[in-house]
């Protein structure tokens, strides 16, 4: 499954070196109008090449052998090739090698904790949805 939010502004919100987790977050549309919070969380991050801010975001698992080979050569990756995820935005391309990323969308206060901060956090917000990028 592909994750695509081309009309949102995403930022690298947090990276934990000790837990090797990456959190991307969007609170606004590209127009800077407020919208529901969207978060993408990836664990077991081995490699990341990405911009700190992304104008629109599509994430998909790299699946074709030719594309895996081309990206592995381009970024100098030799391990965990089955866990490459391509990040595409209007201002460039990025790549992570990680566990399967998850996403969540919820209407919540801007100062609320991450939707991935603890089990059941997303359930606090009516209408919230979650998924995985496989």
Regions found by a protein language model. Give the residues of each.
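Surface-exposed, interaction-prone regions used to assemble/regulate multi-protein complexes
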Residues: 1-134
